[in-house]
């Protein structure tokens, strides 16, 4: 087993990474302080893993809330539904929520945990690659609004993160590829040696080799834990984790949440960001090509939808959370392993990039 720690003083918490971890409830039970917990999951994950988690915790009474699967359900209606269910179950402030699912379930459950009676404990059990390497770690919780992604939310840390790499065996190939976009992101923004390792292990990762998966997930969580410990509330360094997301969120909003997977939109966004880096004279053509080749190797899109140009992007990006003092901030790579936050992408450059 790999055990990491997100170091946030008294709010520090562990990340456990191991195949078949879901069957080992004794460890999970250590983080549930009462004899009652509520499992929040979706209708795809529920028949696959809910009973395994419940059976592994025989001494704890577990109730279940199941919502429909998909990004289109990460909204205030689902948030209200979960709150209503908790109230009808007489959940209390010390009841533990268990988020079992991908990024939508983790983000939604975390936001409910932050809000219900002003804060209740929650545990993340991410079952998709994207949530295992990114959204389950770091305490960003949110739901979407029709005008923008993750517009309503809170910073609220879990008590622990349990990553069972075996859950990836039931993940559709398209979802696995989408998760790889976030894995690649870490190499581009922070670790050129990890990027090179990914280039050398494409076949092993696609085949879901146990050791390759364990290493890549652990390395991503390690990088994220390091960044979050330095900058929990995204005032500086943590913003680098949004590489590809400014463009990506615009693609998701324009296409309708769920029509492009989050990771697919981020992949296309990272290519745009790398090309912007080249246009600024920061990134070499060779490195941009390496980024494109690695993204393509995992069957991910390397360009936005053909119907999206400068005007459409700008219309959505005006609502982006990275707008500060009226200026839109972008995360742009200067080289593989090195990225910056910049507002220096002018209209001429953006038109040339997007039209």
UniProtKB/Swiss-Prot annotation:
The UniProt record lists the keyword NAD: yes
EC number: 4.2.3.4
UniProt key word Nucleotide-binding: yes
Catalyses which reaction(s): 7-phospho-2-dehydro-3-deoxy-D-arabino-heptonate = 3-dehydroquinate + phosphate
Binding site for Zn(2+): 182, 245, 262
Pathway recorded for this protein: Metabolic intermediate biosynthesis; chorismate biosynthesis; chorismate from D-erythrose 4-phosphate and phosphoenolpyruvate: step 2/7
Subcellular location field: Cytoplasm
Protein name: 3-dehydroquinate synthase
Residues forming coiled coils: none
Family recorded in the similarity comment: Belongs to the sugar phosphate cyclases superfamily. Dehydroquinate synthase family.
Gene Ontology CC: cytoplasm
UniProt record, GO biological process: amino acid biosynthetic process; aromatic amino acid family biosynthetic process; chorismate biosynthetic process
Superkingdom of the source species: Bacteria
Cofactor details (free text): Binds 1 divalent metal cation per subunit. Can use either Co(2+) or Zn(2+).
Binding-site list for NAD(+): 69-74, 103-107, 127-128, 140, 149, 167-170
GO molecular function: 3-dehydroquinate synthase activity; metal ion binding; nucleotide binding
Entry cofactors: Co(2+); Zn(2+); NAD(+)
Keyword terms, alphabetized: Amino-acid biosynthesis, Aromatic amino acid biosynthesis, Cobalt, Cytoplasm, Lyase, Metal-binding, NAD, Nucleotide-binding, Zinc
Primary role: Catalyzes the conversion of 3-deoxy-D-arabino-heptulosonate 7-phosphate (DAHP) to dehydroquinate (DHQ).
Pfam families linked to this entry: DHQ_synthase, DHQS_C
Gene3D superfamilies per UniProt: 3.40.50.1970, Dehydroquinate synthase-like - alpha domain
EC class: lyase
Record gene name: aroB
């Amino acid at each position: 087993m790999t055990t990491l720690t997100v170091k946030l003083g008294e709010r520090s918490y562990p990340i456990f990474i191991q195949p078949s971890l879901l069957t080992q409830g004794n460890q999970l039970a250590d983080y549930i302080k009462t004899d009652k917990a509520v499992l929040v999951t979706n209708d795809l994950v529920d028949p696959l893993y809910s009973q395994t988690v419940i059976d592994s915790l025989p001494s704890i009474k577990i109730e279940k809330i199941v919502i429909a699967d998909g990004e289109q359900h990460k909204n205030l209606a689902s948030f209200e539904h979960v709150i209503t269910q908790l109230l009808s179950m007489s959940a209390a402030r010390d009841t533990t929520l268990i988020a079992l699912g991908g990024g939508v379930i983790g983000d939604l459950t975390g936001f409910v945990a932050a809000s219900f009676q002003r804060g209740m404990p929650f545990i993340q059990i991410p079952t998709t690659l994207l949530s295992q390497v990114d959204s389950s770690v770091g305490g960003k919780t949110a739901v979407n609004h029709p005008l923008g992604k993750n517009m309503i939310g809170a910073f609220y840390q879990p008590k622990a993160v349990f990553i069972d790499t075996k859950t990836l065996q039931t993940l559709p190939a398209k979802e696995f590829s989408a998760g790889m976009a976030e894995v690649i992101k870490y190499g581009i923004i922070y670790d050129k040696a990890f990027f090179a390792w990914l280039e050398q292990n494409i076949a092993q990762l696609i085949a879901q080799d146990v050791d390759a998966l364990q290493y890549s997930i652990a390395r991503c969580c390690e990088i994220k834990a390091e960044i979050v410990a330095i900058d929990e509330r995204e005032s500086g360094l943590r913003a680098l984790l949004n590489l590809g997301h400014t463009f990506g969120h615009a693609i998701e909003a324009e296409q309708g949440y769920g029509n492009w997977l989050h990771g697919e939109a981020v992949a296309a966004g990272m290519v745009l960001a790398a090309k912007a880096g080249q246009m600024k004279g920061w990134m070499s053509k060779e490195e941009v090509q390496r980024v494109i080749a690695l993204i393509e190797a995992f069957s991910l899109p390397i360009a936005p939808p053909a119907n999206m140009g400068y005007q459409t992007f700008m219309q959505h990006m005006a609502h982006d959370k990275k707008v500060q003092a009226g200026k839109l901030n972008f995360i742009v790579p200067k080289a593989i392993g090195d990225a910056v936050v910049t507002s220096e992408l002018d209209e001429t450059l953006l038109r040339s990039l997007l039209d």
